[in-house]
């Protein structure tokens, strides 16, 4: 079997396709959560604690300046506000995944429905057994 046909067989397996769909949906979900955190959740929280824009929160370790030659030196900044936004995004995504896994586990633990009656094979075996009993009763000399 050639390399291309083996790869095609591998790529068309259900697990690989499911994984690809999951990655695409996950990327889209990440963008939705980012917008939710940055545009809907954090602004009211920032407003409630004094009109704080979390994305601009930072510690300035060294302010921007100009050296002796007139060259601009950028500031050294730790942007912890973006980190806070990212942590909130992570918590939301982790909670959503937790809920999905919990739902999947609950669905997979459901007990299968009890069979509604004997299977076709069991019915056939019973018929054969009964027929053999009748034959034995009618003709007891047959071993």
From Swiss-Prot:
Pfam families: MscL. GO terms for cellular component: plasma membrane. The keyword Transport applies. The keyword Ion transport applies. Belongs to the MscL family. Channel that opens in response to stretch forces in the membrane lipid bilayer. May participate in the regulation of osmotic pressure changes within the cell. Keywords: Cell inner membrane, Cell membrane, Ion channel, Ion transport, Membrane, Transmembrane, Transmembrane helix, Transport. It is found in: Cell inner membrane. Its main location: membrane. This is Large-conductance mechanosensitive channel. It is a multi-pass membrane protein. SUPFAM superfamilies: Gated mechanosensitive channel. Gene3D superfamilies: Large-conductance mechanosensitive channel, MscL, domain 1. The chain crosses the membrane at residues 16-36, 84-104. Homopentamer.
């Amino acid at each position: 079997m050639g390399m291309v046909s083996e790869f095609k067989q591998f790529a068309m397996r259900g697990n690989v396709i499911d994984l690809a769909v999951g990655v695409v949906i996950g990327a889209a979900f990440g963008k939705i959560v980012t917008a939710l955190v940055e545009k809907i959740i954090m602004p009211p929280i920032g407003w409630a604690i004094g009109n704080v824009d979390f994305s601009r929160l930072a510690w300035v370790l060294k302010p921007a300046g100009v050296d002796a030659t007139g060259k601009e030196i950028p500031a050294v900044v730790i942007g912890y506000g973006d980190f806070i936004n990212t942590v909130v995004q992570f918590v939301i995504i982790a909670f959503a995944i937790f809920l999905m896994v919990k739902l999947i586990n609950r669905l997979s633990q459901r007990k299968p429905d009890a069979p509604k009656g004997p299977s076709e094979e069991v019915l056939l075996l019973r018929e054969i057994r009964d027929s053999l009993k009748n034959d034995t009763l009618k003709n007891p000399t047959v071993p």
